Amino acid sequence: LKDPNGRGIIALYLSLLEESDAAALAARVVRAWIAQDTYVGSAMADKGLLAFAVGMDDGELAGLVRAYMRDNPGRRAQFDALVRALCANGRDRALQVLLGVARRHKMAGVQATAAALAREIASERGWSDEELADRTVPTAGFDGDGLLRLSYGDREFTGRLTSDFKIEVSDGAGRTRKSLPPARSGEDAEVVRAAKKRLSAARKEAKEVLTLQSERLYEAMCASRTWPAAEWRELLAGHPLVGRLVTRLIWTATPPEGGPLTFRPTEDGALIGADDAVVELEPHAVVSLAHRARLTDEEAAAWREHLVDYGVEPLFDQLSAAVPRVAKGQTEMRDLQGHMTDTFALRGTALKRGYKRGEVLDAGTFDAYVKDFAALGLTAVLGFTGSWVPEDKMVCATTSLTFTRRGRPVPLDRVPPVLLAECRADYAALAALGPYDPDWEVSASP
């Protein structure tokens, strides 16, 4: 019982059972392993029991793994086993957790393992890593028309996503409800419980999709990723959940001939420009996320006005961060060094912008917050004067912005312009926390 990958003999044996029985058995074994390993215990000697995860409901497995990683932050060996179990399960919700770890995790070894497993699955299916992420986004039970259909037997209910990704329920008469009603006399209690369970799971899953896909679309913008028009329509605009996020972003279509066109999808499926004119998406065009780095001042201003006029809350800012000028071969920015703040304020801003604590040095200090951009193989590094672990509130100052690839410095002129602009904005956000102090090196020593 050493291998948590159950895609061999365990999967074969589970396939001999009724699907519901196999899922129940698998869940019982995996839950027992986690219970034994939680807090003071360790079940690593029997990690092969996680092979049963191959037969679990992927949503249940995803929830268990997320909770374990959140509540047991230092268990690297267990994390390694769990990501292998996610890989073996191979269904959408399990893979989304695997892909999330592959994109960003505080343990580099666990992140590397997850990334390698994700590449393995993508290769098996004939997809790129990014295609795998696109094609495995859960729908939370919503149909292609954007509706969640729930049944009590004779009574039918419909769930619709609100703008903040909550689910609003309506009955057959169109009356809106916050939740599903209790069963009536004569209605099957099991059917009612199943509908309520489905709604609860859908609400949780929709919230997870909002968080994970917002992050992924932001990284796609930073990486200047492109989609063939047909794939963009199918996998993004046509997805019942991601499609709602797509309407809160500005896109660029570049046809084989001619210049790029910027547009925004509306909730009724139309594509419109900043001037409200309909934009035709050519079949052979490539689509990418727009950014201030590739827009004129006039275009950016027009889109700002458009978003206000339509009452659209952008999923994230595409129109503010400008590309800084850098010299050839320059490897760091230091023009915003010496801005004074405290370690808690700096930490809060860095974490909010997607960064995590950098490597802890031998003396128990750290002096950077880092953010990985896996698709580009780059890590952004926001330097500061440092703090101790465990942390206390103390004076600190900003120092630098750098980028690394596999631990080595990367010249700034080789960083994609959009990524450079966005990380420069992160650097500026830290500097904005406090004024410049000409004696910062003395004032902010850790």
Provide a role label for each language-model segment:
Residues 1-90, 95-96, 102-446:
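Non-catalytic terminal/accessory regions
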